[in-house]
């Protein structure tokens, strides 16, 4: 089951997550959101412990929707290291979602360090100078 989060939870659940995050923006009136949510629920079980899955009601959380340029529903925004790294608009087939998730995990494994926001150096660069 995917946790539904609000603006209050967004920072802790998405931006501070140690795992990559699959954030699915939906609305009750959106007919294509239902099959997307069904597929996302199945993928959440498959990727448990590797990717965090959250659902965000786009109508109730307009500030987040605007900040992350959610212009269509459903919209899926993939986050890594607190940054949006991919955006999928509209209904997505299971194979397309799985491909995006596998790419996200592969990129995570091949990354060479995360940027330190103050000086632009990676954590690896900083450890070399100690």
Language-model segments: which ranges?
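Short active-site neighborhood of thiol/selenol oxidoreductases, capturing the structured segment around
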Residues: 16-28
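N-terminal "domain-start" segment that seeds a small globular fold
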Residues: 1-12
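Thiol-based oxidoreductase modules, predominantly thioredoxin-like and allied folds used
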Residues: 4-6, 25, 40-44, 48-63
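Structural micro-motif
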Residues: 19-21, 68-80
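Non-catalytic, surface beta->alpha helical segment in thiol-disulfide oxidoreductase systems
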Residues: 77-112
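Short acidic DE-rich linear segments
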Residues: 111-130
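Conserved redox-active cysteine motifs that mediate thiol-disulfide chemistry
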Residues: 25-39
